[in-house]
């Protein structure tokens, strides 16, 4: 990104990655692609002679992302799983202001990936208007896991749940390169729901960057891959309840697994981490 307005630099690459994965994963300041007479490239470093100089390139933006992840890992006591570290970074990345427009939504995952990570301090401390829930486990074939929880009381008004929810799922499925584009052999899905008065479930969540023109039901496999990130180890979902839900019954976070045909059965299961952030967008609760 440019240091002046966080827009794309002239040398920014555009995704997609292999197996249609989101690439780039993140973006960060890389310096202007030209020399400005006042600020140079806007990104400064120290050369071999200890002199301050200006540079640009992905070789400078990538270490800034890696530094943030390293600081997060260092400040957490004990061993942190790979899935949890990645989930923390993805969950706490934001869309730079220059890209926060409706007309850019369908292009963002190929331009900025999951966004620009915030600081390690903010990742670990959050803010006073949100709460983070972390679910980390392993899931075996043909199994599903259900986590029940209650919506924060401060966000329940008139028997309706308000607020904003963002969910990041990171897993490490089996990979077999002999299958080419189908190398990822396992897929995890996550749903967020409430049980209605008639006993049926009301499902929420929408994949990040999903094209609103794509229908919600009856999607073809290619649509599930492109829009719902099927067979992707990283999935991000978001939902804002501006008008509140229809009721405030207990919530269920459900994780399910599906495998490709002829997949090698793993006895330990696929490791995963889910981070769910519930926040008050009005900054009052």
Feature-to-residue mapping (PLM):
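Secreted peptidase-domain scaffold signal
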Residues: 105-196
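Residues within well-ordered beta-strands of beta-sheet-rich folds
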Residues: 27, 164-170, 252-254
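Catalytic-core environment of secreted peptidases
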Residues: 1-62, 79
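Charged/polar, low-hydrophobicity segments characteristic of intrinsically disordered regions
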Residues: 96-116, 199-214
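Extended, solvent-exposed segments with strong compositional bias
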Residues: 128, 134-135, 200-244
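C-terminal edge strands of extracellular/lumenal beta-sandwich accessory domains
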Residues: 183-198, 239-285
């Amino acid at each position: 990104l440019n240091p002046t307005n966080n827009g794309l630099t002239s040398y920014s690459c555009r995704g997609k990655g292999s197996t249609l994965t989101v690439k780039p994963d993140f973006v960060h300041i890389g310096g202007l692609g030209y020399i400005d007479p006042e600020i140079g490239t806007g990104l400064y470093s120290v050369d071999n002679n200890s002199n301050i100089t200006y540079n640009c390139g992905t070789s400078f933006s990538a270490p800034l992302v890696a530094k943030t992840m390293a600081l997060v890992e260092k400040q957490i006591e004990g061993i942190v799983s790979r899935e949890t570290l990645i989930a923390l970074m993805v969950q706490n990345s934001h869309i730079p202001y220059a890209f926060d427009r409706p007309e850019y939504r369908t292009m963002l995952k190929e331009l900025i990936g999951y966004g620009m990570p915030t600081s390690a301090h903010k990742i670990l401390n959050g803010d006073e208007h949100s709460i983070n829930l972390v679910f980390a486990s392993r899931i075996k074939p043909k199994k599903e896991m259900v986590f029940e929880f209650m919506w924060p009381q401060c966000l329940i008004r008139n028997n309706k749940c308000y607020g904003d929810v963002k969910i990041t799922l990171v897993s490490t499925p089996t990979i077999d390169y002999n299958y080419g584009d189908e190398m990822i052999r396992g897929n995890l899905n996550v749903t967020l729901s409430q049980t209605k008065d008639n006993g049926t479930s009301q499902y929420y969540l929408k994949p990040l960057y999903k094209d609103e023109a794509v229908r919600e039901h009856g999607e073809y496999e290619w649509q599930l891959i492109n829009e719902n990130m099927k067979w992707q180890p990283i999935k991000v979902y978001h939902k804002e309840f501006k008008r509140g839900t229809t009721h405030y019954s207990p919530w269920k976070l459900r994780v399910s697994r599906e495998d490709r045909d002829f997949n090698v059965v793993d006895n330990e299961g696929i490791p995963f981490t889910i981070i769910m952030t519930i926040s008050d967008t009005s900054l009052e609760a």
